[in-house]
């Protein structure tokens, strides 16, 4: 008879690496041209003035300025960057 039980197998123990999504520069903060503002899956936020969109729906600043989050509709928000005057 064995003194130790055989090591059984398990179906658990795996997890995916986090994708680090979310807002990187918040409203009222300063952004430099090229700065990533939001990393997202799909277009939760739409690009507004002076904001570009990457092929993975990442929003980034096209000019230096202040980031603003604006409501287009009740549910839909767009992000714009306005240059400092």
UniProtKB/Swiss-Prot annotation:
Q: Keywords of this protein's UniProt record, alphabetized?
A: Ribonucleoprotein, Ribosomal protein
Q: Mind telling me which InterPro entries this protein's record contains?
A: Ribosomal_bL27 (IPR001684), Ribosomal_bL27_CS (IPR018261)
Which terms in the GO cellular component ontology are assigned? ribonucleoprotein complex; ribosome
GO MF entry, a single one: structural constituent of ribosome
Task: Kindly list the biological process annotations in GO that this record carries.
Answer: translation
Q: Which HAMAP family match?
A: Ribosomal_bL27
User: What family does this chain come from, according to its entry?
Assistant: Belongs to the bacterial ribosomal protein bL27 family.
Matches recorded under PANTHER family: LARGE RIBOSOMAL SUBUNIT PROTEIN BL27M, RIBOSOMAL PROTEIN L27
UniProt name for this protein: Large ribosomal subunit protein bL27
Tell me the organism.
Leptospira biflexa serovar Patoc (strain Patoc 1 / ATCC 23582 / Paris)
